[in-house]
């Protein structure tokens, strides 16, 4: 609950929607304490609504089209299912258009079932699923976060409390190959930073030279 709200909002928007969410390190799910969600919901929705989408040769656009018809069908199907699911609420976005290119609006879905497939499946697109937990349920939520998805490439923790950052990072050691503190999940600097995943996302074997040995 002690996080910097502005930094968190920027990280969620950029982490989820840069490159249309089509990068391996994109943020696809977020677990937010209820007190934090209440503080940032309006700003998060507004910032997402403000994102422009269109021709990538026009540098005023933040997003372009998703890569192909199969990706579009996967994203459109997931959004249609979310709209029909009483456990889900579309906070912003949700529209798709394939008349010219394969465009998927940046979308945030509020999910009230922590075992929902939106929190475990990898859509690889501009869809951010958010689960809001009660502030006092942090330990149970960390267990959920650690156990829900088979993928474990990147993650991020936001807090001004250094002790909390250290405790949570240790608890989630196997939940992400690259775990960022107070920064969005992103790519690595090849040859300078270890980058890789855990579990279904690999074993830190992609870049970073001898630094990869630090995991063991």
Language-model features and meaning:
Residues 1-114, 132-139, 143-147, 181, ...:
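ALDH superfamily catalytic-core signature
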Residues 2-3, 52-53, 64, 96, ...:
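Conserved C-terminal structural/oligomerization subdomain of aldehyde/semialdehyde dehydrogenase
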């Amino acid at each position: 609950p002690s996080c910097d709200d502005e930094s968190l909002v920027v990280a969620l928007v950029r982490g989820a929607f840069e490159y249309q969410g089509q990068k391996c390190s994109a943020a696809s799910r977020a677990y937010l304490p209820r007190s934090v969600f209440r503080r940032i919901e309006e700003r998060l929705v507004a910032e997402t609504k403000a994102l422009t989408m269109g021709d990538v040769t026009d540098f005023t656009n933040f997003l372009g089209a998703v890569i192909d018809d199969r990706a579009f069908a996967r994203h459109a199907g997931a959004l249609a299912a979310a709209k029909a699911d009483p456990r889900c609420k579309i906070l912003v976005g949700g529209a798709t258009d394939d008349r010219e290119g394969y465009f998927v609006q940046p979308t945030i879905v509020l999910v009230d079932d922590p075992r929902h497939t939106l929190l475990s499946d990898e859509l690889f697109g501009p869809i951010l699923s958010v689960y809001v937990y009660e502030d006092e349920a942090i330990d149970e939520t960390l267990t959920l976060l650690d156990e829900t998805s088979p993928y474990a490439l990147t993650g991020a923790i936001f807090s001004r409390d250094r002790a909390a950052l250290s405790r949570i990072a240790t608890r989630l050691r196997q939940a992400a190959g690259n775990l960022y503190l107070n920064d969005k999940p992103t790519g690595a600097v090849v040859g300078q930073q270890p980058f890789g995943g855990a579990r279904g996302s690999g074993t830190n074997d992609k870049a970073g030279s001898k630094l990869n040995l630090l995991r063991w």
